[in-house]
Regions:
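Generic, low-specificity signal for short hydrophobic/alpha-helical stretches with a mild N-terminal bias
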Residues: 7, 39, 65, 87, ...
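Conserved protein kinase catalytic domain
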Residues: 22, 26, 51-55, 106, ...
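Surface-exposed helix-capping loop/turn segments at secondary-structure junctions
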Residues: 33-37, 63, 88-98, 149-156
């Protein structure tokens, strides 16, 4: 009988890996189902990156978690540009001694957010040359979050954080359990 492809969730880290995972399913389906393989592959609508799947689930459940479903997603480059704009607005791009560049600021922010760690600990461990800028970075990160909220923007870190928050809601978790029979995660060990 097999599994209903509409009830399978396939996730991976990169678009390339998601495409490869989908191609593998297509090859297996063609080998097993022959001419009927399209039934399997066309029904496989929940395959993609963690961020893409997360964005889709967040839009589906936005009202329940207090999120505007019309959010825009910033990729790393867009996020770095917004960080730079906020950095400039705060006058941090014109300091006497060189303030960290936008990419470094975004890396620090992302590390702190994803690790749910204190900024000072992140700086000491991974960015020791930026320790002297801790207070300015806190101000920058607060303004960056405000700018994202004002623009209804989520960055890649936000997608994962909101997804984790969404999965803390028992009703939503139950809905997800009833939606999927199989969850396949590529490179799970990573």
């Amino acid at each position: 009988t097999g599994a209903d492809p509409r009830r399978i969730l396939l996730m991976t880290f990169s678009r390339r890996a998601a495409s490869e995972m989908t191609r593998r399913v297509e090859r297996i389906a063609a080998r097993v189902l022959g001419d009927r393989a399209s039934i399997m592959t066309e029904g496989l609508t929940w395959a993609g990156t963690f961020h893409a799947i997360g964005a889709r689930l967040l839009r589906d459940n936005a009202l329940e978690i207090g999120l505007d479903a019309a959010f825009t997603i910033h990729d790393r480059e867009d996020s770095a540009d917004l960080m730079n704009l906020v950095r400039h607005d705060l006058g941090l791009s014109k300091t006497e001694s060189r303030f960290p560049a936008k990419g470094t600021c975004l890396a620090i922010y992302s590390r702190a957010v994803n690790a749910q760690a204190e900024l000072e600990a992140v700086l000491a461990k991974s960015f020791p040359w930026c320790v002297g800028w801790a207070e300015e970075l806190k101000t920058l990160f607060g303004a960056y979050v405000e700018a994202k909220q004002a623009q209804n923007v989520l960055d890649y870190d936000d997608l994962l954080l909101w997804w984790a928050q969404m999965c803390a809601e028992p009703a939503i978790v139950e809905q997800l359990r009833s939606r999927f029979d199989h969850i396949l995660v590529d490179e799970y060990q990573d």
